[in-house]
Amino acid sequence: MKIDDINIELIKELKDGRRSFKSIADKLNITENTVRTRVSKLKEENVLDICGLFNPSALPGHNMVIIGIKLSEMNLVEKGEEISKLRGVICATVVTGRYDLILQVLFNEEFGLLEFYTDEISKVKGIRSVETFVVYKSYNLMVPYIL
């Protein structure tokens, strides 16, 4: 899918996901039907998602960690996809540097770090080592509720 200037402007306007397609169309000088069609296409292509986000530190009993993973083999994409489907994983990214993958993981009172390592990560073969970074305070962090 080609991302043009109109698509970028649509994405910017949808920062407020409750905004009407009509008001966006009026601002961008395009038709409401064009907005609707383009947003549908952006969603189908996994370029855009419209969802409620929250600050994990604002909800009692919730926190987030960042986990660096070193793999024993260089099957980065395959392992990234596999790990991204584990419970609590907000995102898994293939990175440069001392880790092969970096994860953002969400926890609550019923599902914590111990459960993540014993019930989820332990299922994944080919992990050489992990390092966990507990997020004490974050700025501008908003994530989807996935638990």
Residue ranges and their predicted role:
Residues 1-147:
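A compositional/biophysical signature of low hydrophobicity enriched in polar/charged and small residues
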